[in-house]
Structure formats: structure tokens, C-alpha cells
């Protein structure tokens, strides 16, 4: 992979057993170049009104980006303003990253809860 390419991957967190839990993320993976913008989407289970986003760089643990509760930002990690988000009335969510940098190459995770 060339130095100007960013490899983005997403992980869908699914529950086990007969209880429907989890989220659906899209797209499942992306390849972008430095300076571009990306939007990642997360749809949570019906009734889950809290959505959290995390970034996990290779060889590291997940880092908290931000959390939304009922369409309002409810907490934010140590990420620059070019990382922004939204939560919609149906409690689905978006993570937007502007002016991509090489260090943004990571696994992006979303989680939902009541």
C-alpha cells in the first residue's frame, strides 16, 4: 500500500444467542487518500438511544471518539474537531472525518446501548 493511501475497516459488533442485539455499520471497509473526507454510518437496534464511536489503531486498544445520547453529544475523547458526528431521531449515527491523515488508518467501531 502506498504512503498516501489510508485503509479503513469497520467491524460489525453483533450479539450472540436468540436476543437481537448489536449494530450494523456501513460501509464495511474503505480505502481513501490523504486529505479526503469519509462518512461512516451506524444503525443500532430499535430502542437503543446511546451510540458510542471508537477508533482502534493496529496493535492498540480502542480509543473513545465520542458518544451521543438522544441526538446530543454526551462525551468526547481526545480527537481533533475534524472528527465529528451526528445522531438522528431514529438513533442511527454517523462519524465524519475530514482532511484524512495517515494516522487515521484504523478500525472504527460503533456500539449502542439503552
UniProtKB/Swiss-Prot annotation:
PROSITE patterns: IG_LIKE
Main localization, broad class: membrane
Any single Pfam family the record assigns to this protein: V-set
Family annotation (SUPFAM superfamilies): Immunoglobulin
GO terms under biological process: adaptive immune response; cell surface receptor signaling pathway
Limits of the Ig-like domain: 22-114
Glycosylation sites: 90
InterPro entries linked: Ig-like_dom, Ig-like_dom_sf, Ig-like_fold, Ig_V-set, TCR_beta_variable
Cell compartment(s), UniProt: Cell membrane
SMART domains: IGv
GO cellular component terms given for this protein: plasma membrane; T cell receptor complex
Signal peptide segment: 1-21
Disulfide linkage: 42-110
Keywords, comma-separated and alphabetical: Adaptive immunity, Cell membrane, Disulfide bond, Glycoprotein, Immunity, Immunoglobulin domain, Membrane, Receptor, Signal, T cell receptor
Subunit and interaction comment: Alpha-beta TR is a heterodimer composed of an alpha and beta chain; disulfide-linked. The alpha-beta TR is associated with the transmembrane signaling CD3 coreceptor proteins to form the TR-CD3 (TcR or TCR). The assembly of alpha-beta TR heterodimers with CD3 occurs in the endoplasmic reticulum where a single alpha-beta TR heterodimer associates with one CD3D-CD3E heterodimer, one CD3G-CD3E heterodimer and one CD247 homodimer forming a stable octameric structure. CD3D-CD3E and CD3G-CD3E heterodimers preferentially associate with TR alpha and TR beta chains, respectively.
Task of the protein: V region of the variable domain of T cell receptor (TR) beta chain that participates in the antigen recognition. Alpha-beta T cell receptors are antigen specific receptors which are essential to the immune response and are present on the cell surface of T lymphocytes. Recognize peptide-major histocompatibility (MH) (pMH) complexes that are displayed by antigen presenting cells (APC), a prerequisite for efficient T cell adaptive immunity against pathogens.
Listed name of the protein: T cell receptor beta variable 5-4
Organism: Homo sapiens (Human)
Amino acid at each position: 500500500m502506498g504512503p498516501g493511501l489510508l485503509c479503513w475497516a469497520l467491524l460489525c459488533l453483533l450479539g450472540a444467542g436468540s436476543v437481537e442485539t448489536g449494530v450494523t455499520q456501513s460501509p464495511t471497509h474503505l480505502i481513501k487518500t490523504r486529505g479526503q473526507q469519509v462518512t461512516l454510518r451506524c444503525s443500532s437496534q430499535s430502542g437503543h438511544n446511546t451510540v458510542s464511536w471508537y477508533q482502534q489503531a493496529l496493535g492498540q486498544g480502542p480509543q473513545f471518539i465520542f458518544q451521543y445520547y438522544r441526538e446530543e453529544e454526551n462525551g468526547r475523547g481526545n480527537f481533533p474537531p475534524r472528527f465529528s458526528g451526528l445522531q438522528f431521531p431514529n438513533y442511527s449515527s454517523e462519524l465524519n472525518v475530514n482532511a484524512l491523515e495517515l494516522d487515521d488508518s484504523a478500525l472504527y467501531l460503533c456500539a449502542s446501548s439503552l
